[in-house]
């Protein structure tokens, strides 16, 4: 155990490398993500165990403890139901999954400590984001031109996944990591700001936009536009680029939409589905047999939630309660997905009203301590540009009116708790010094 954290350059470099590898691990897949998370947690506990234990516990930390404790309680409650009714051959399956999910509580405290104590140099994370997202974008271009990417992966009918093969998540990846690239020069290489940034920004934006459009993930593309718009509105240094941004987006999208039938069909299909959802919702025609697939997945949460209104059905049990229990209850086959494709609806069905209230309270506090304090008060956060991309990517990630993957999967949970840990670490006292290089 080391008593001093200020004279450990090798250890600082080690943790900086692990954090810089996060964008790379998301390309490599869940196995590498889990390995990286494991190394961050175990290394932090082995090296800084006593210091982490002594970290000042704030109110938000207590809410995180309560949230994870409630996950365990919900799992235990549901597993007892499964065992007494002889439903699952594997005893306490939900409880085991819930204990494994506890790794994200350890990840939060480990990362928060490393950020708060300035052990990690985030510059290399930003550099990694730049090169990783450029690689994904260029690989998508290659796949679009030659019919397969550099690894030999071929695209689906309407989407180009690049290095992700049959996982259609390239657009989501670019949304999550490419925005950090825009802040690399303004934050870490300020002396080059006036010389190359005006050329650097439009070039990157065009590359990432084309990559997003070809990837075919419509919701990530919309959230990308939404996030960039928020950045230009709230971030003073970017406000003057709003019309440049809008012009570039309009031209790039219009050209690709007009001259590429695959992209046109993909976005036309999305527009058609959204229009149907609006009409069905407005007319309250929820029994319509022609409901879009996404609407059916969203709407499937309601009857499932009614089965366990207050404490939920336990994490990753949505399919069981939606499909098996409702089929038994109604006598009709109920076909369901593994989750309702929305973080909030998933938490509501799997952790009930109590779990959702805890999650919403945590989100509101984080937004207050970061977004509100930076842009609506005289807090010292006003001068901290390092926190800016993390704030708006957090808003994008937890935006309520959008389709999502499962909250409890490796990919989504790792990203979300990483963003949260960095945000809270950066807001702590005496942690507002940025790299002046």
Which residues fall in each region the model found?
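Transmembrane alpha-helices of multi-pass inner-membrane enzymes
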Residues: 16, 39-45, 183, 225-229, ...
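Alpha-helical transmembrane segments of multi-pass inner-membrane proteins
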Residues: 20-23, 106-108, 121-155, 165-237, ...
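Aromatic-anchored transmembrane helix interface
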Residues: 65-66, 85-113, 124-128, 133, ...
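A conserved mid-to-late transmembrane alpha helix and its immediate loop/hinge
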Residues: 209, 299, 308-311, 332-370
């Amino acid at each position: 155990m080391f008593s001093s954290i200020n004279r450990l350059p090798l250890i600082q470099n080690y943790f900086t490398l692990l954090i810089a590898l996060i964008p790379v691990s998301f390309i490599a897949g869940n196995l590498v993500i889990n390995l990286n998370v494991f190394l961050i947690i175990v290394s932090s506990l082995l090296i800084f165990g006593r210091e982490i234990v002594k970290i000042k516990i704030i109110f938000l930390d207590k809410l995180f403890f309560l949230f994870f404790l409630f996950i365990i309680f919900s799992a235990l409650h549901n597993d007892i139901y499964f065992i007494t009714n002889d439903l699952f051959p594997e005893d306490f399956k939900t409880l085991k999954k819930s204990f494994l999910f506890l790794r994200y509580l350890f990840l939060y405290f480990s990362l928060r400590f490393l950020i708060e104590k300035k052990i990690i140099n985030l510059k290399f994370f930003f550099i990694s984001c730049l090169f990783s997202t450029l690689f994904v974008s260029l690989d998508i271009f290659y796949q679009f031109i030659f019919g397969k990417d550099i690894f030999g992966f071929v695209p689906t009918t309407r989407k180009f996944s690049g290095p992700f093969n049959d996982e259609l998540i390239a657009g989501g990846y670019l949304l999550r990591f490419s925005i950090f690239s825009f802040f690399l020069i303004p934050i870490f290489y300020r002396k080059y700001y006036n010389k190359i940034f005006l050329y650097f920004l439009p070039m990157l934006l065009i590359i990432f936009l084309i990559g997003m459009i070809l990837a075919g993930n419509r919701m990530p593309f919309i959230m990308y536009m939404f996030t960039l718009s928020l950045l230009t509105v709230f971030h003073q240094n970017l406000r003057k680029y709003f019309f440049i941004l809008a012009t570039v987006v309009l031209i790039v999208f219009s050209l690709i939409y007009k001259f590429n039938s695959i992209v046109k069909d993909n976005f036309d299909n999305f527009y058609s589905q959204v229009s149907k959802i609006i009409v069905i919702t407005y007319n309250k025609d929820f029994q319509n047999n022609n409901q879009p697939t996404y609407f059916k997945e969203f709407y499937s949460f309601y009857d499932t939630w009614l089965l366990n209104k207050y404490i939920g059905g336990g994490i990753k049990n949505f399919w069981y309660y939606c499909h098996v229990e409702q089929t038994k209850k109604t006598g009709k086959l109920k076909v369901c997905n593994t989750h309702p494709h929305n973080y909030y609806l998933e938490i509501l069905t799997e952790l009930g009203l109590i779990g959702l209230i805890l999650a919403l309270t945590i989100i509101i506090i984080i937004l207050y301590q970061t977004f509100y304090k930076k842009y609506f008060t005289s807090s010292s956060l006003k001068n901290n540009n390092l926190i800016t991309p993390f704030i708006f990517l957090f808003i994008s990630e937890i935006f309520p009116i959008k389709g999502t993957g499962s909250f409890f999967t490796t990919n989504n949970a790792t990203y979300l708790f990483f963003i949260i840990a960095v945000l809270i670490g950066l807001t702590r006292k005496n942690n507002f010094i940025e790299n002046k290089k």
